[in-house]
Structure formats: structure tokens, C-alpha cells
Amino acid sequence: MGEIKVSPDYNWFRGTVPLKKIIVDDDDSKIWSLYDAGPRSIRCPLIFLPPVSGTADVFFRQILALTGWGYRVIALQYPVYWDHLEFCDGFRKLLDHLQLDKVHLFGASLGGFLAQKFAEYTHKSPRVHSLILCNSFSDTSIFNQTWTANSFWLMPAFMLKKIVLGNFSSGPVDPMMADAIDFMVDRLESLGQSELASRLTLNCQNSYVEPHKIRDIPVTIMDVFGQSALSTEAKEEMYKLYPNARRAHLKTGGNFPYLCRSAEVNLYVQIHLLQFHGTKYAAIDPSMVSAEELEVQKGSLGISQEEQ
């Protein structure tokens, strides 16, 4: 149990990439926690937004791999925000504080929904250059819990954890998926009552994405064919909403492919970001491009051969 937590990679990550804490709101209790790794000269980095159960370090495998290729990557953990507008306003202030005009966003589950809402919120003065949406959704009504959204704040932590764990895979899983679930359960345990209640509120509060406001943003939809908390209907809805999106399908990986299928996820992220190389919105150090592009081409060739 807990293989990932004691792995050399995770411990090296925790030992070398500092966790920063930043306050951008008038309320001092609203603290953003983040890992910012890779070349600071990059002004349009890739930012990772976690699911309900996740902390910033659930993306450590993306941070290690992508910074090794010359990308600047930031992984975040949200403060306690109770509605989407409050989140979007806080996130905008955070980007201002970090002096980032535009960013690429990778959002997992709730993180993907919030990424879309932020793109929508800033559509008149765009801050989002592209989106990677992993196991994500565009309408909170799919969870059939909009009626309970206003009562999460009253529930004790153990009850909230039970709600979240109910969405974790309960069927047979391979060892890597089992390790990923163990790690996410451990991360879930580290979250306090207000953190969990606020995230569940954001996840279930009645809201949907207005696609006409963000239709010009390049999107990659990343989803898992096997078991995941998302219904087929929710996935189909995403395809309809973004008809021009690139699709990155993983055969297996459950709810947390960034942990248990990290090589595939990292490759799809690189393929998505390739389209911005050579522009001012590149997330990579220009001197690293040629070597990195060759590797991506080799990797994508391998994936397409496997699928045939």
C-alpha cells in the first residue's frame, strides 16, 4: 500500500520542487498552494488544476517529465471558494500576481470544469490560450446533486470523504491503478472539512459552460474508455460542445490517468502543446524544441502503431 508515496520519484519531487503559498484575496485564510517548475522566462506556462480529491502534488509525474523537456509547469491547489465566480476572480488575481497574461490549462474532472468556467469568465479579455480537459464535464447537473450543493458546508469531514470515495473505482483494477487510488485516498485524507465541502459545492452547484464564449480556444479532450466516474453521456456531451477538439483516448487508466498512465498522458500533453511552439504562447524553452519534438514524434508513432 502507498507505493507512490514512498517512491523515489515522489520523494525526489518533494525534495526539489518547493511548495509555495500565495494569498491574493483580502481574506488571509484563502491560500493558493502551488508548485512552479521549469524556466521562469516562459510567460505562458501550463497550469494543472486538480479534481475534488486532489492536491497540487497529484501531478508530480507531469511536473517531473515536462520540466525535463524544458516546459514551465505550475500545479495548483485551490483555496476555499464557495462559488464559480469567486473562484474565477481569485484565479485571475493569482495570474496577475504571477505576472502571467495568458496560460494553458490542464484540468482533471472538477479542475477541467473550473478551467472552462475561467475561460468563459475571461472571454472578453482572454487569459486562457488553450485547454486540456481530462475526464471532465461541462454541466454539473450530471451528478444529480445540485439540490445538495448548498448543504455540503454543514456536513462533517468523514461524510464528505465518503461521498468522494463513492466515485472511486470499486471494480477490478491493475496494480498501477490500485497505487493511484491509494495515493488519491491519502491526498483526500489530507484535506480539511472546509476544503472538501467547498470543492464538492463547486462540483455540484447548478452551472454549465457556455460554449459560444470559448469556441476559439484550442481544446484537447482526454478521456478513459475503461472505468471512470464519468458517464458515457457526459463524455458525448463534451464532444458535442467542442466539435473541433482533438481527442486523446486512453484505453485504461480509471479516474486518475495522470498518475497510473503518466507516460501516455504526458505524451498527449506534449502533442497538444506542439501547436504553440515558435509562438509567444509556447510553454517550452525554445532551445529545447528540436530534441523534444523528435521524441514526441517517436512516441506518437508508437501509440498509433499500438492502436492498429
From Swiss-Prot:
Location of the AB hydrolase-1 domain: 87-159
GO CC field: cytosol; trans-Golgi network transport vesicle
Record's keyword terms, sorted: Cytoplasm, Phosphoprotein
UniProt-listed InterPro entries: AB_hydrolase_1, AB_hydrolase_fold, Maspardin
Subcellular location: Cytoplasm
Entry-linked Pfam families: Abhydrolase_1
Keyword field contains Phosphoprotein: yes
A GO MF label: CD4 receptor binding
Modified sites of kind Phosphoserine: 304
Keyword Metal-binding: no
Free-text function comment from the UniProt entry: May play a role as a negative regulatory factor in CD4-dependent T-cell activation.
Self-association state and partner proteins as the record states: Interacts with CD4. Interacts with ALDH16A1.
Family: Belongs to the AB hydrolase superfamily.
Protein name: Maspardin
Species per Swiss-Prot/TrEMBL record: Pongo abelii
Taxonomic classification: Eukaryota, Metazoa, Chordata, Craniata, Vertebrata
